[in-house]
Amino acid sequence: MEKFHAQYEMLETIGQGGCAKVKLARHRLTGTHVAVKMIPKREYWCKLLMFEAELLMMFNHPNIISLLQVIETKKKVYLIMELCEGKSLYQHIQNAGYLQEDEARPLFKQLLSAMNYCHNQGIVHRDLTPDNIMVEKDGRVKNIDFGLSTHVKPGQKLNLFCGTYPFSAPEVLLSRPYGGPKIDVWTLGVVLYFMVIGKIPFDAASIEKLRKQIVAGKYSAPCRLSVKLQHLINLLMTDNPELRPTVAEVMVHPWITKGSGVFPDPCEEQIPLKPDPAIVKPMGHIGFQAQDIEDSLRQRKFNETMASYCLLKKQILKECDRPIRDQPMNPSVTPFPSLVDTPTFHLGLRRRETEPTGLRLSANRQVSVCGKSTSKKRDRSFIWPGVLSRPINTTPTMDQTHTRTRSVPCIYSNVCTIHPNSIDESTEGHTSASAEDKPVHSRGWPRGIKGWTRKIGNAMRKLCCCIPSKETSHLGQSRVCPKK
C-alpha cells in the first residue's frame, strides 16, 4: 500500500465492476492523471482479472488502452492504466443521435485497426460493445475492456457463451462451437449499425424474441444509408459465419477506403521499445538511470520507471499542443508539475549559451512517433526543452557547472516565438552572454535608458566585491557570483 501511495495520489472512483474498482489517481512525479484498477486478491476473481492484465501487457497499439504499471501488495493488485479523457461510444452516439457516414468512418476504421491487431496476436475480444469503446476529445478511439477476451489458435473453436446478448452472433446463441474472430466481425457490424442509425439492429421485449431475431438475421436498414454502407453492414452481419469476412478483408471494403484510405499508423506504439534521449536525459536529473529506463521499456517490465517514462512523454506531447498562456506562472508555486499549474514563461525568451539545449520544434512540421513529419501552413516555432529539473539555489552562469536539484522535478512548457529569426537579429546587437548578465525573468528584459543604466550599474557592482548588489532574487532563486 505504501509503495502505491508513494507514487500515486488516489482520487475519486470512476468505475465499478463486479469484483474490482477503477479509481482516478494522480501520478505524483508528473501530475498526470491515470486510471487504476484495484483487484482484491481473491483466488478466483483475481485469476480472471490478472488474465486481462496479461493480455494488456501484450498489446501496444494506439487504439487499445495502455497498461503502464503493475503494483502488487499483500491484499491487492493495482493496474495503472492510461486515462481516456472523453466519453464512451454509447454516450457519444446518445448525444449526437447518430453519426453521418463521414463522421462514423474514421472512428470505425480505428476499431478495425485495433481488432485486426488483436486477431493477428491470436486474441479475440468477444465483448466489443459501445460501452467498452472510448472516444477521446481528439477523436481517437480506445478499446478499454478485455475482460472476456481469450487466446485462440488458427482454426480453434470455442464453446463458452459470453458477451452482451444484443451484440452476440447467431452461432453463439445457438450454443454451437464458434470461431472467435468471426464473432468479433459480427459484433463490429452491430456497432457500425448503432453508430449510423442511433439504435441497435436487434431489440425485443424478451430474451427469446431477441434470440429469434438475431438467429434469423433480420433487421431494417434506412434508405438514407449509401449503397456501399448497406452492403458493408449486411456483409458484417452475415448469419453464416463461414461466409462472414475477416477483419483484414473488411479493411479494404469500398466504404472503408472511400476518401482517405489511411488507417492508424501501425508504428505509433504507445510504449516504445527504444527510449527517446530527449526524455531520458531529464529523467536522469531526477534520479532515474538511463540503462534502467532502456531495460524497462525493452523488456516491458511495467514498473515505476516504465510508467514514469510513458507519463512524462504523454505530458510533453500534451504541452506541445497546449496554447501558450497569456500570463507567466511562478515556478516556485507548485513543487510538482500538474495539469492545473504548469510553469510557463513569457513569449520571446532568449536562450543563452549556458541554458540546457532543448528540442526545437516548428509548428509548421508535425513530428510523428515514427520520425516522419508533415507540413502545415503556420510559421511559428516552439522551444521544447523537454523535462528539466528546476534549479533552486543557482542560476545558470557562464563557464560554471550547473547545479540541479533532484528533489523538485519540473516540466517546463513550450515557449513560443512568433518570429524565429527575430531572436538572432535582436541578439546580434548585444554583447555576448556573460556572468555579469542579468538572469532572464518572466517579466522580460529592461527597456529604455533607465533599464540599461540599472543593468550596467548592477554589473559594475558585481565587479567590485565590496559593493553589494541591489538586485533582489526572483522566483525563489538566488544569484550565483561568477568564479574568479
Curated annotation (Swiss-Prot):
Keywords: ATP-binding, Kinase, Nucleotide-binding, Serine/threonine-protein kinase, Transferase, Tyrosine-protein kinase. Residues 8-256 form the Protein kinase domain. It comes from the Eukaryota. It catalyses: L-seryl-[protein] + ATP = O-phospho-L-seryl-[protein] + ADP + H(+); L-threonyl-[protein] + ATP = O-phospho-L-threonyl-[protein] + ADP + H(+). Residues 423-434 have a biased composition (Polar residues). The active site is at residue 127. ATP binds at residues 14-22, 37. PROSITE patterns: PROTEIN_KINASE_DOM, PROTEIN_KINASE_TYR. Its EC number is 2.7.11.1. Pfam families: Pkinase (PF00069). Residues 423-447 are annotated as: Disordered. SUPFAM superfamilies: Protein kinase-like (PK-like) (SSF56112). Residues 274-314 form the UBA domain. The keyword NADP does not apply. Tw12 allele. Encoded on the T-complex, a region of 20-30 Mb on proximal third of mouse chromosome 17. Naturally occurring variant forms of the T-complex, known as complete t-haplotypes, are found in wild mouse populations. The t-haplotypes contain at least four nonoverlapping inversions that suppress recombination with the wild-type chromosome, and lock into strong linkage disequilibrium loci affecting normal transmission of the chromosome, male gametogenesis and embryonic development. May play a role in sperm motility, especially in the regulation of flagellar function. This is Sperm motility kinase 1. It comes from Mus musculus. The gene is Smok1.
